[in-house]
Amino acid sequence: MKGGETMSVRRSGYKAVVDGVGGRRRREDDMVEIRKAKREESLLKKRREALPHSPSADSLDQKLISCIWSDERDLLIEATTQIRTLLCGEMFNVRVEEVIQAGLVPRFVEFLTWDDSPQLQFEAAWALTNIASGTSENTEVVIDHGAVAILVRLLNSPYDVVREQVVWALGNISGDSPRCRDIVLGHAALPSLLLQLNHGAKLSMLVNAAWTLSNLCRGKPQPPFDQVSAALPALAQLIRLDDKELLAYTCWALVYLSDGSNEKIQAVIEANVCARLIGLSIHRSPSVITPALRTIGNIVTGNDSQTQHIIDLQALPCLVNLLRGSYNKTIRKEACWTVSNITAGCQSQIQAVFDADICPALVNLLQNSEGDVKKEAAWAICNAIAGGSYKQIMFLVKQECIKPLCDLLTCSDTQLVMVCLEALKKILKVGEVFSSRHAEGIYQCPQTNVNPHAQLIEEAEGLEKIEGLQSHENNDIYETAVKILETYWMEEEEEEDQEQQDMIYFPVDNFANMPTSSGTLSEMHCGP
């Protein structure tokens, strides 16, 4: 498998690679289900609902539109509030198009500049917030009318309610796409946003600011790290608070900041957030557990030293809890992925996983869990086999990992088949040593000429599955299967054939009368 096309493709996503099939793996785009799931869509854009008893209108009629162009301040505030309320209610998609078609967006942007009317600024910012929460086309309208620069300026408003609403508006704009995010960053929004996270800020401001920060840090292509890493000190303070929503947004920001090079990972480590992240990985709320766990998972894709930092902070007992508990599929999958990157490390790190009693939980998931979870559990075990010592591999065999690995040889995921095949090959190699005279004293087992791991694979119906892979369309899988069969079973078949030949005999009484080309043996033996 080394040097093969399959592994070269897989390795392109690694942070580091160990010999064999294993290696630390960055999260692949097709693995990131939660980024496409509905529960995270709420992170990207949020529409603010109407306050109780807000003045409202039944529809956007011409009279209401004309009021927006009035010179009377009180009438402007009332009309803007009514339109904003329409944008908070039902039929949002219809209402936002009506507002845009009526040409009201540039008027709302103009109201943002009226510093002598903070109430009008607030209502206009709220209306723009909800417009930007719509489609990408809706967001583009807000951007195209110059709202971003003015919103960033309003982060310095003396009025808390205005600043908080502006933070929300910028969060919706930056959450639309990487291009919109970069426009907001390009207007130097981040430094002013970080100023909102002071000790006197209300919880609602902290929550909104953390959410907007997460949107400024997310997306592919990623934002310039030297720009967004300025948020790390603030995030390190926010993560020490207790509000569930605030913690979730803060952890998501850390997910995005830790997703990348070892230099990025090191910056997150140096922000002193890892111990708190590990504690949050067993939080009561899945909305906090998921991003906390994913950040930990990102960190252990780094080098051995960075991975060891997480181990030293006692992450493994938390991971055992997540693997054994009744958590949702996403959390169990994330936990397995995290462990797989730890078992891709050095042998002492593999041993730390063993000592934490994680292997039984992995084997259980490998046998009984859903496909995605099973795949990550397989990677965790196969990485340990790839980089483990013979003694460590023997330990995994005793944990009964062979049968579930054999069962995966028939799955449709060619990368996973290859990984399991390589793991079984390593197991067979260890079994060969085990059966040789050199094994005596190492495993303290009786000497035998039989490869016990080959027997276990046969009992698990693995031999017939490996034989079936000789017709696999993937050339690497085919070649590896053939090599395994030639190395560990062909010789056995030859020995059996020889034994059968040795069993052919003639009765002793008739031996002298055995016919030959020159007569019987007795005749050939008689002399003159």
Curated annotation (Swiss-Prot):
GO BP term (any one): protein import into nucleus
Main location: nucleus
Gene Ontology CC terms, in alphabetical order: cytoplasm; nuclear envelope
Sorted UniProt keywords: Nucleus, Protein transport, Repeat, Transport
Pfam families: Arm (PF00514), Arm_3 (PF16186), IBB (PF01749)
GO MF annotation terms: nuclear import signal receptor activity
Coiled-coil annotated residue ranges, if any: none
Domain IBB: 1-56
Keyword Repeat applies: yes
ARM repeat windows: 93-133, 136-175, 178-218, 220-259, 262-301, 304-344, 347-386, 390-429
Subcellular location: Nucleus envelope
Subunit structure: Forms a complex with importin subunit beta-1.
Family per similarity comment: Belongs to the importin alpha family.
Function: Binds to conventional NLS motifs and mediates nuclear protein import across the nuclear envelope. Acts as a cellular receptor for the nuclear import of the virD2 protein of Agrobacterium, but is not essential for Agrobacterium-mediated root transformation.
Entry protein name: Importin subunit alpha-7
Species, as recorded: Arabidopsis thaliana (Mouse-ear cress)
Lineage, uppermost ranks: Eukaryota, Viridiplantae, Streptophyta, Embryophyta, Tracheophyta
Encoding gene (name): IMPA7
